[in-house]
């Protein structure tokens, strides 16, 4: 990478993309504390209420800030377009949430997001889901990339049914050094997207297993 391109790269992303990764919320803020496990099986016919955990809300804010810097950086003529586009693509703040909601919609009859628990319970859902997500992307001060997705399922009395999850973590080689070609840097940054998608696919498999197990248990009990 040319010195001029490297300087543009550092100038654009050092400040904005060095944004602090979201802090991990206390465990109690990301789950309900049931008295007992639920005997309610998960089924395709159920109506599901979704709540976002504190981790999910913090992660969304982090991704939106990161993405805004990436989009602004893409307008810098001194920055190779392959690099800037890789940052834009890998920081899409809607990718994970959109994927997770689609996954739930494939497995249940109705899926609705609510702002708070009271609103969710007033809708009388069959199942309540706490969606807990965490993402961390590469920055000048961080080379550890993470993507964690978890959905905890509870019955209408907030007793625990089970959970689906997917996660990936990887330490990336530094992209902030002179001598690397732009295609190599872009490819490294694009690995963030690959990591996120692999974690989401793992979540899908886990969710399908959980719902299938619930259906089998329901049939066996009849």
Task: Give residue ranges: language-model regions.
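Bacterial N-terminal signal peptides that target proteins for export
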Residues: 1-9
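A structural "domain/chain start" motif
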Residues: 23-97, 209-222
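C-terminal/domain-edge helix-coil "capping" segments
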Residues: 25-43, 157-222
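Surface-exposed short loop/turn segments
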Residues: 26-31, 116-163
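Sec/Tat-exported extracytoplasmic proteins
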Residues: 52, 100-108, 112, 200, ...
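Generic short beta-strand segments
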Residues: 55, 132-136, 167-169
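Short, solvent-exposed, polar/charged sequence segments at loop or secondary-structure edges
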Residues: 85-134
């Amino acid at each position: 990478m040319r010195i001029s391109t490297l300087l543009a790269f550092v100038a654009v992303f050092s400040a904005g993309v060095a944004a602090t990764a979201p802090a991990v919320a206390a465990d109690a803020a990301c789950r309900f504390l049931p008295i007992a496990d639920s005997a309610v099986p998960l089924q395709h016919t159920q109506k599901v209420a979704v709540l976002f955990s504190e981790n999910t809300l913090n992660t969304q804010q982090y991704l939106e800030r990161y993405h805004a810097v990436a989009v602004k950086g893409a307008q810098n003529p001194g920055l190779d377009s392959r690099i800037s586009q890789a940052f834009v693509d890998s920081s899409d703040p809607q990718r994970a949430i959109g994927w997770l909601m689609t996954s739930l919609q494939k497995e249940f009859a109705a899926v609705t997001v609510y702002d708070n628990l009271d609103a969710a319970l007033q809708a009388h859902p069959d199942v309540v889901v706490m969606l807990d997500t965490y993402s961390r992307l590469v920055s000048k001060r961080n080379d550890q990339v993470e993507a964690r997705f978890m959905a905890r399922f509870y019955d209408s009395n907030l007793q625990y049914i089970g959970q689906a999850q997917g996660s990936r973590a990887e330490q990336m080689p530094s992209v902030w050094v002179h001598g690397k070609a732009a295609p190599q840097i872009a490819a490294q940054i694009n690995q963030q997207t690959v990591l996120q998608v692999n974690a989401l696919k793992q979540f899908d498999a886990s969710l399908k297993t959980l719902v299938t197990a619930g259906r089998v248990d329901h049939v066996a009990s009849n």
